[in-house]
């Protein structure tokens, strides 16, 4: 087995019919953690339902259905391997809450794979003003992604046309450049997620494709397939030396064990014996044990999805959206208010002070009021255009002061990136995205459990 491969997380984005499920399903199917027996069961079931031809997407549909029913499915099913990496697919899209998940979840992703349908009319629909392709790519950039792979899918439906491919590459390079990506650092790969061309093996149908190349500070890399492009992702730097921040996804009550909060370590490390604080709940207690995938860990590191057992804390005291931190090392606090730079993506009217939509920031989902519009700025240059604007509308970018309607814990993006970016949701869509510049924190005395008091004396 040798040394374990580095883990990387990818998110797959693109228009609804671009073939994301088929492409992702194909990778998971061919290089993934699904055992042969499960695959055979899937195939049999798909055939019985007359979905024989649909097996890759079907794999994903099965997994997704289980995930949505709340069955904690074996996360190995969402993994596949490249020569260098263990890859986890963070979100298989097509999910209603995909954009919300992107904001709350992609703090996790190291790279975005943008799937584009090459078919006539399909590409145009995806990239049109209201197509999802642009919105997803803009979100990815705003959320701090700098690594992008573009796969131009369904090349079989274009009769493997080089002209069509070149036309799409030119158009996509243009719009991702406008957003802020450097197209030179982005590999473009023509694929058929369905037939498997250029997925794992070089296609014989596109002899004209001489391969992708990407240039980054680390040097230039080339390859032929999507798998190679994923293998060429720059290895992520995990922020384990920062103080602990762990937003809770759920809190379980487990018989014989007690209260078990679950979440992903975003920064720092968590280990047994640590005295942790939950904000904004203001509860302090000792961590009894930390585990991942039912195995005890000596410490949870950034990127790990862990469950940890805490003493003398009831399930009613803490909840999803709370943030766990080390009580002795820059503990997290409740946020009274914060200033943020927001980009208005799509709002039918005008937004003025007093607007109070729901914010999704890490795992918190709380209404926040735009209490003051401080200044309007040019989205591309970041320069100030106007002080105290009366309103902002779609396409504008502004610095605003926000006040949460209920206790909430957020951080400045520069200190803790995953806790410093958010989506503004209203009318079932993402109205704006934002990055937090500064936070006004609340100091409040909270509940310190007996276990914490005892552990602190040690």
From Swiss-Prot:
A Pfam family recorded for this sequence: GTP_EFTU_D2
Residues with N6,N6-dimethyllysine modification: 3, 316
Region named G2: 70-74
Residues with N6-methyllysine modification: 3, 30, 316, 390
Record-stated family: Belongs to the TRAFAC class translation factor GTPase superfamily. Classic translation factor GTPase family. EF-Tu/EF-1A subfamily.
Gene Ontology cellular component list: cytoplasm
Region ranges (G5): 192-194
PTM annotation (N,N,N-trimethylglycine): residues: 2
Record-level Gene Ontology MF annotations: GTP binding; GTPase activity; translation elongation factor activity
Region (G1) location: 14-21
Function (record text): This protein promotes the GTP-dependent binding of aminoacyl-tRNA to the A-site of ribosomes during protein biosynthesis.
Name the UniProt record assigns to this protein: Elongation factor 1-alpha
Positions of GTP binding: 14-21, 91-95, 153-156
Protein's cellular compartments: Cytoplasm
Gene3D superfamilies named in the record: P-loop containing nucleotide triphosphate hydrolases, Translation factors
Gene name in the database record: TEF-1
């Amino acid at each position: 087995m040798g040394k374990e491969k580095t883990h990387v997380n990818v998110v797959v984005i693109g228009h609804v019919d671009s073939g994301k499920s088929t492409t992702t399903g194909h990778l998971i199917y061919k290089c993934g953690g699904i055992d042969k027996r499960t695959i055979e069961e899937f195939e049999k079931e798909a055939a019985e339902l007359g979905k024989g031809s649909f097996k890759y997407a079907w794999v994903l549909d099965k997994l997704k259905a289980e995930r949505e029913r709340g069955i904690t499915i074996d996360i190995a099913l969402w993994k596949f391997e490249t020569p260098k990496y263990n890859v986890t697919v963070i979100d298989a899209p097509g999910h209603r809450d995909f954009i919300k998940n992107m904001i709350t979840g992609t703090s996790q992703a190291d790279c975005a794979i943008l799937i584009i349908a090459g078919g006539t009319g399909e590409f145009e629909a995806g990239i049109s003003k209201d197509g999802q392709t642009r919105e997803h790519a803009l979100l990815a950039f705003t959320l701090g992604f700098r690594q992008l792979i573009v796969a131009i899918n369904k090349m079989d439906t274009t009769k493997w046309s080089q002209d069509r491919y070149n036309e799409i590459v030119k158009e996509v390079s243009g719009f991702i450049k406008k957003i802020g990506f450097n197209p030179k650092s982005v590999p473009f790969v023509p694929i058929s997620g369905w037939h498997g061309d250029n997925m794992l093996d070089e296609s014989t149908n596109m002899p004209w494709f001489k391969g992708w190349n990407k240039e980054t500070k680390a040097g230039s890399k080339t390859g032929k397939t999507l798998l190679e492009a994923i293998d060429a992702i720059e290895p992520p730097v995990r922020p384990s030396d920062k103080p602990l921040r762990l937003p809770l996804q759920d809190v379980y009550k487990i018989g014989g064990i007690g209260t078990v909060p679950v979440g992903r370590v975003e920064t720092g490390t968590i280990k047994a014996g640590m005295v942790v604080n939950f904000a904004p709940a203001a509860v302090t207690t000792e961590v009894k044990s930390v585990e991942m995938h039912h195995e005890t860990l000596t410490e949870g590191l950034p990127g790990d999805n862990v469950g940890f057992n805490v003493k003398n804390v009831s399930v009613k005291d803490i909840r999803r959206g709370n943030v766990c931190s080390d009580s002795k090392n820059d503990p997290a606090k409740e946020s009274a208010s914060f200033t943020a730079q927001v980009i208005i993506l799509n709002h039918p009217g005008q937004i003025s002070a007093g607007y109070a939509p729901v914010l999704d920031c890490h795992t918190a989902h709380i209404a926040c009021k735009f209490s003051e519009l401080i200044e309007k700025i040019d989205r591309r240059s970041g320069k100030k255009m106007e002080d105290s604007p009366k309103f902002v509308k779609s396409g504008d970018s502004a610095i605003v002061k926000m006040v949460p309607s209920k206790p909430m814990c957020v951080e400045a993006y520069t200190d803790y990136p995953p806790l410093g970016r958010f989506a503004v949701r209203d009318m079932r869509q993402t109205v704006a995205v934002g990055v937090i510049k500064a936070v006004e924190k609340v100091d409040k005395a909270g509940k310190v459990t007996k276990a914490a008091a005892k552990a602190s004396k040690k």
